[in-house]
Amino acid sequence: MCGIIGYIGNEKASKILLKGLKRLEYRGYDSCGIATIDDTIKLKKNTGKVLEVSKKENFEDMTGFIGIGHSRWATHGGITKNNAHPHYDCSEKICIAHNGIISNYKELKELLISKGHIFKSETDTEVIPHLIEEEIKDFKEITEKTYINAIQNTIKKLNGTYALLILNQDFPEMLVGVRNESPLILGIKKDECFIGSDISAFLEYTKLAMPLNDRDIVILRKENDEIDIEVLNYGKQVQRDTIELQWDMESAEKEGYEHFMLKEIMEEPVILKNSMKISKLEIENLGKEIEKCDKIYITAMGTSLHAAMVAEYWFSGLNKLVIPIDSSEFLTKGIVDEKTLVIAITQSGETYDTMKAVKYAKEKGAKTATIVNVLGSTATREADITIMMGSGLEIAVCATKTFMSQLVILYRLFIEYGKIIGKNMDIFEKELLNIPNYISKVLDEKENISKIAEELTAKNYLFISKGINLANALEGALKFKEITYLHAEGMSSGFLKHGTISLIDENMDTVALIPPSKSELLNSVLSNVEEIKARNGKIIGISPVEDNLKYSIKVPDVIEEVSPFVYATACQLLAYYKAVDLKRDVDKPRGLAKSVTVE
């Protein structure tokens, strides 16, 4: 992985591909490359940032109206020029860009080497062009039909996940894409087509998109001034629906902010209003399913899992057991049958482990639903019920506004279920409408939070709370370590004295999420804070009450059920400003990807 873009049309391909790779930078990468076809295939690639590599390799000098580009995040082989994508076959007539992981590449590589193929990289990807080359040898004549057959025969040999873009010098007016458990979507115009791992790569050119299904092979042919699109699945021609994208390019611009992350945090009050309005019927339907089903799981990864953990507390207040579960553990822990409901939360709709959990649940006969931000993604096509988040495009790798949208959707679901079972949910409905104002008050604290962040010098941090905001302690720690590169650990404040308190000294700072004034947990958390102070630990309080702390971030004193919203924004700002203070790459932290599409 991590990002791919293809172009076929009447414009200079290298220019389009370069811009597309820039748009895909937020997905994370360590090297990049471009291949174009103009009689022969020209390939240039190297390690480093897109603009650095472009300048070094002269991307803009590459000619041709058809091409593919790739930004790589190393999974097999080191960060080297040879390991960067795209990759050739032996003849340098076939060129491939690939997202995903080929799990049986070692056996395939050994077989190909035994047949005389020479490899130049350590990657799993490089076996693919060589396999196609080998398959073509079996045909007496190279025609379009035999070429496509060679691709079909090749993918039958591949185990794993892949989104492929393929150029062939013998077919200079053609671009082929293949999808299997790794996202690939077409952007369509009459005289040109774009194909990429997500819509941000081509959103500025067209809003008409065609998501591809697993095992699809899409053949794009340039015929005079138009592009012919053919989709095959298991050798048979199929039709795929197109969708009209709702996002616009303004979402992909910083609009005066230093970083996308800060822009996206500042957008939260407006975004949450959007999330309060959408998917009303779907939320009603999902509420009914929750009432009917015996077992309810919310499966997710990373930040989305923390949203699921908040929901667990909301539903427990209605005496309904809802179990949050790490998607990568779902197949070993989830007890699933026909009376089970599995709700998958995934911002991208492509998270590999979460999609694997959904497919497993469907195989067991469970009802499935998804809370997702990308229309036309795999999640929307796999799940029985789709609830859109309404967050708009999120560019920064760290999830901020999408986390808040997930919370709003889950909170609305909690309200809906409560009404279905006859509970009075008036206070919760009233407070839902107040959440954007509460978030705005937290955003007003940003200068204070920035000053506090500058004074923090520790290398290790604890984030603690209790009850419903335990999830926010975990989320706060995750955000902090993601972008500051400092060690941070979230836990229940009650867990401290069971081992972790031995770490407390002047070199370990603690961020305490202090409960609202009417919470039964307030005195308990304050007592834990005193225990830390007694051991010379520095406390940063995120608090709606008077806490007598040197470092204190004030948040509105709200009902406990709504408190996760205000603590989340405060934690996001603290992580952001500390990362800025440390001069980190805030929007693209090292080693991370926006959409994790491999196991």
From Swiss-Prot:
<dbReference type="GO" id="GO:0005737">
    <property type="term" value="C:cytoplasm"/>
</dbReference>
<dbReference type="Pfam" id="PF01380">
    <property type="entry name" value="SIS"/>
</dbReference>
<dbReference type="InterPro" id="IPR005855">
    <property type="entry name" value="GFAT"/>
</dbReference>
<dbReference type="Pfam" id="PF13537">
    <property type="entry name" value="GATase_7"/>
</dbReference>
<protein>
    <recommendedName>
        <fullName>Glutamine--fructose-6-phosphate aminotransferase [isomerizing]</fullName>
        <ecNumber>2.6.1.16</ecNumber>
    </recommendedName>
</protein>
<dbReference type="InterPro" id="IPR029055">
    <property type="entry name" value="Ntn_hydrolases_N"/>
</dbReference>
<dbReference type="InterPro" id="IPR035490">
    <property type="entry name" value="GlmS/FrlB_SIS"/>
</dbReference>
<dbReference type="GO" id="GO:0004360">
    <property type="term" value="F:glutamine-fructose-6-phosphate transaminase (isomerizing) activity"/>
</dbReference>
<dbReference type="InterPro" id="IPR046348">
    <property type="entry name" value="SIS_dom_sf"/>
</dbReference>
<feature type="active site" description="Nucleophile; for GATase activity">
    <location>
        <position position="2"/>
    </location>
</feature>
<feature type="active site" description="For Fru-6P isomerization activity">
    <location>
        <position position="594"/>
    </location>
</feature>
<dbReference type="GO" id="GO:0006002">
    <property type="term" value="P:fructose 6-phosphate metabolic process"/>
</dbReference>
<dbReference type="InterPro" id="IPR035466">
    <property type="entry name" value="GlmS/AgaS_SIS"/>
</dbReference>
<keyword id="KW-0315">Glutamine amidotransferase</keyword>
<feature type="domain" description="Glutamine amidotransferase type-2">
    <location>
        <begin position="2"/>
        <end position="223"/>
    </location>
</feature>
<dbReference type="InterPro" id="IPR047084">
    <property type="entry name" value="GFAT_N"/>
</dbReference>
<keyword id="KW-0032">Aminotransferase</keyword>
<dbReference type="InterPro" id="IPR001347">
    <property type="entry name" value="SIS_dom"/>
</dbReference>
<dbReference type="GO" id="GO:0097367">
    <property type="term" value="F:carbohydrate derivative binding"/>
</dbReference>
<dbReference type="InterPro" id="IPR017932">
    <property type="entry name" value="GATase_2_dom"/>
</dbReference>
<keyword id="KW-0677">Repeat</keyword>
<dbReference type="GO" id="GO:0006487">
    <property type="term" value="P:protein N-linked glycosylation"/>
</dbReference>
<comment type="function">
    <text>Catalyzes the first step in hexosamine metabolism, converting fructose-6P into glucosamine-6P using glutamine as a nitrogen source.</text>
</comment>
<comment type="subunit">
    <text>Homodimer.</text>
</comment>
<dbReference type="GO" id="GO:0005975">
    <property type="term" value="P:carbohydrate metabolic process"/>
</dbReference>
<feature type="domain" description="SIS 2">
    <location>
        <begin position="452"/>
        <end position="589"/>
    </location>
</feature>
<feature type="domain" description="SIS 1">
    <location>
        <begin position="286"/>
        <end position="423"/>
    </location>
</feature>
<keyword id="KW-0808">Transferase</keyword>
<dbReference type="GO" id="GO:0006047">
    <property type="term" value="P:UDP-N-acetylglucosamine metabolic process"/>
</dbReference>
<keyword id="KW-0963">Cytoplasm</keyword>
